[in-house]
């Protein structure tokens, strides 16, 4: 018994070992697409786990743990390679701008329900300067909803602008006519936009965060419902909203593959949308604008948060 305790003390509680073993366990489980809510959380933090592994490497060097530091570097390399290669639908960027024919500029902004309506004037100025064709708002209070209505002169078309909205509902504003609008009970908005003689289906959605078992299961049901919508929608499709998934997540990569939707992710020009109070390079992107394969991304950026815990995501597409 004493020998076993001594072995545990040497291997587990030796300086740096707890952090080292925790890092290995997190790396392993975060790359599995398990239907377990507390493990799923780690899958969305791939970039942060990698940064933690690099910091751990220097800690192990400081503690003179040579072999542990070597293993740590090796795991970091394998982990980074898996992150970079896991999403085959995250590379839809237009490299040759001479191919641009038609453009569509979109903004998705989770305003945050508790955001003061006093911040709307700055939000309005941002929208005017970015000149989008389509704007989607999410998580807005009744007071902020009243402010959004003042944009009617700029965006004359909308998805039921005058109807009351819940905290997880979406509201789409457009400069171009919207037809066949449908708002359902799954926090999903579906509408059609015709631009340059091309009909485009736009789906706005707010997926629940998987922080609890109940919310995680509800989010999986929403994803299953979205797959059905995408399957029954025309080939020109844009899906946007707070998806509560990051590009490093296996669940996100699987969703893109099964719906045949695309996006563009750059780890050089990071666009973290949440949480806005953290530096961009430490945050995560949970707000997305996804599209079918006949679109390509021209530009993607974020701006100031204007009192929200999310940053607005701005994307320009070519089609």
At which residue positions do the language-model features occur?
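Structural signal for the C-terminal ends of transmembrane alpha-helices
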Residues: 58-67, 230
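Positively charged n-region of N-terminal signal peptides that target proteins for export
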Residues: 2-3, 44, 64-68
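Short, Lys/Arg-rich, polar N-terminal cytosolic tail immediately upstream
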Residues: 1-9
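Soluble catalytic domains of enzymes that build or remodel membrane lipids, polysaccharides, and related
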Residues: 106, 113-128, 137-319
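N-terminal signal-anchor transmembrane helix
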Residues: 62, 70-129
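Short acidic/polar active-site loop segments enriched in Thr and Asp
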Residues: 133
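Membrane-embedded alpha-helical segments of integral membrane proteins
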Residues: 13-60
